[in-house]
Structures are given as C-alpha cells and as structure tokens.
Amino acid sequence: MTHQPQQSPQFFLTAPSPCPYLEGQQERKVFTHLVGDKANEINDLLTQGGFRRSQNIAYRPACEVCRACISVRILAGEFEMTRNMRRVWSQNRDLIGRVHKAQPSTEQYALFRDYLDARHRSGGMSDMTVLDYAMMIEDTHVNTQIIEYRRRGPDSFMSAKGDGELIAVALTDVMADGLSMVYSFFLPHMQERSLGTYMILDHIERARAAGLPHVYLGYWVEGSRKMQYKIRFTPQEHLGPRGWQRFEG
C-alpha cells in the first residue's frame, strides 16, 4: 500500500448549493485544509492555481456545468492608473495604512458590522458574530496581515501611524509572488471616497514597493455587477485552460 505523505493536502468536494453570483445556477467547491509546516507553500501554489483562502481552507469552484468564475490577478509592475483612479488616489491622500499582525479587535468588528449591514445585509456573511469575525482573522497558518486605514495625524510622517477613527480594513495574504486580498471592508457612508478602489490601488503600490509582481483579486464573473470592478485594473491576467493569459480590458 502507498501511504500519502502527511504534508500532502487532501481535497474534498462540497454538495451543490445556490450560486451567490448567477441566478439559477448551482455551485460546488473543491477544498483542502491549510495546516502544518507547508501551509504557506501550499497556499502559494494553490492561489497561483486559482484557489482562494477562507480561514484555514483553500477552495476553488468545481461546478458541474458552469465555468463563469475566473481567477484574476493584476500585473502590478505594469499597472497605470486611469484618470478616475488618480482622482480616487488623490482624494484619499489624507489616509495612511498601517500593517498589523492578523489579530481582531472590537473596533474592526464594529466597522465590519456597519459595512455588512449597509452593503451585504442579505449576504452569506450577514449573521457573523464577533467570534465568527475573530475566526476569519485569526484562523490562518499562512503569512497573513491586517492593514488598518486611518486619517494621517500631525506625527504620521514620523510614526507611520494614522490618527482617529478606523476608516477601512484589508485582510491580506503575503505570497512569494504577490499580495492576495482576502477580504476588505470600510465605512459605508464614505461612498464618495471609493474606498474599495483605493485599497486595491494601495495594494498595487505595496506590491511594487516589495518587488512583488501580482495582486490577486479572487474571482471575476462576467455579468455579475458586484464583480465588475475587478476588470478595471489593467493590465491583468485571467486563469484559463492554457494558464494565466493577459487581459487588457
């Protein structure tokens, strides 16, 4: 009998459930657990192969009749802002992002709840408790960080710290070839700031500064309004049967 090495991931398939993006479709996912000494390495390989991480699980769509979910990653080194993106970047120049270990706080959860209640009241995460949120942040065996965005204070140029209320948060995996944006949320009443766009732009700049070629955005579904923003950040690559292919929009 051949024994599977302990570090080799085992994969499982979920039962069919309603698709959250395309009405009338059923989704299934293949998933594995990210645990052990090789969790970082496995997460890198799986993300490069179209998987996403949620807590200590890596998953990707494995639907029987639909292939609409397409993995997207931005080519950070080649990216150029559009006029509108430059406006968003300038509009948020009073913000500063500070990197922290992946640890939850009551301040983060309060912002998270405000965001869900305003933007995703009927979504699958709408009933998450403070303990659920803590698990989302802490239950990880990979190189994960929290970036908290606040307004710049009088000493920010020295301390690199923001001042005042928490405005936005990004949960981000640091990979060998890029940054993977796992989840982000922000003050919902600041719509004029386009904070979701700003955080993606900030991650592109962070990837460039670290010499990392990619920013992973997860899945794009053509025809899904909630996913449409992802293809505005070009050039980017889409994962298909022939591997990662360049996409200019």
UniProtKB/Swiss-Prot annotation:
Question: In which domain of life is the source organism classified?
Answer: Bacteria
Gene Ontology terms describing biological process: ubiquitin-dependent protein catabolic process via the N-end rule pathway
The places in or outside the cell where this protein is found are:
Cytoplasm
Keyword Transferase in annotation: yes
Which GO molecular function, any one, fits this protein according to its record? arginyl-tRNA--protein transferase activity
What does the record give as EC number?
2.3.2.29
Disulphide-bonded residues: none
EC class (word): transferase
Kindly report the protein's main subcellular placement as a broad class: cytoplasm
Keywords noted in UniProt: Acyltransferase, Cytoplasm, Transferase
Record's InterPro entries?
A: Acyl_CoA_acyltransferase, Asp_Glu_LeuTrfase, N-end_Aminoacyl_Trfase, N-end_Aminoacyl_Trfase_C, N-end_Aminoacyl_Trfase_N
Q: Name the protein family.
A: Belongs to the R-transferase family. Bpt subfamily.
Function noted in UniProt: Functions in the N-end rule pathway of protein degradation where it conjugates Leu from its aminoacyl-tRNA to the N-termini of proteins containing an N-terminal aspartate or glutamate.
Q: What name is this protein filed under?
A: Aspartate/glutamate leucyltransferase
